[in-house]
Amino acid sequence: MDLNQLLKGVKGVVAETAQFIRTERIQFSHEAAQVKGLNDLVSYVDKTSEEKLVQGLLQLLPESGFLAEEGTQAGLKEWNWIIDPLDGTTNFVHGIPCYAISVGLEHKGEIVLGVVHEVARDEQFCAIKNGGAYLNEKAIRVGATKRLQDSLIATGFPVNNFDQMQGVLNALEHFMRHTHGIRRIGAAAADLCYLACGRVDAFYEYNLKPWDVAAGALIAKEAGAIVTDFNGGAGWLHGRTIMASNPTLFEVFSAVIQTSFTNLS
């Protein structure tokens, strides 16, 4: 499999879908959004974007399977696309310009290709395993911040699982007191890419799904970040927790997360 050649095709499919989303946002109204679950919105834009992505990706890799947020299930195979057609739907619905397309390719349990396109800013992040990370064709690296007190931290809040709310509050209090600040962007894929290019220095969140992190985590890793689950292991893709930072900060940053959150399986 020539991943470099495949990446070129994926970037094109994602860019075309991003243009569709930008066009639809101009005429989009709140009434077009539907409630998928507690605090969880979906729209025809999510669904149509997923259809466009699936169609384009199947043309590139006909033998692939799919795991996608809006329900596309083509049976898991040796090569599987993990897709969020519109990460940050609530931002999109409310006109907040931070939402992204996330496409990761999994091979035998490992993410080997990732593309995240932040639609409103028209920024496309990408990576392949052992190939570095890029933003609009330029190589990117994580920041070099050495001290927690000089760092900017990104996180997300739970929308339908509040079992670890005390952990959320514990971590927030610590980082509010001991960093430059906390940013809650509202799209995990964008958070991870912001880490990859040095806009933030660390990211953590719990209760995530594979399509939230598949592409962004690979991009962050290829940009030099350390990425683990909350236990410090490799279960971030399916384990529903993720923490990531530049290597210099990781020891102290991860200690805060592990002290704040308890009773994690």
Predicted feature locations:
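Small-residue (primarily alanine) positions within well-ordered alpha-helices
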Residues: 10, 14-17, 114, 133, ...
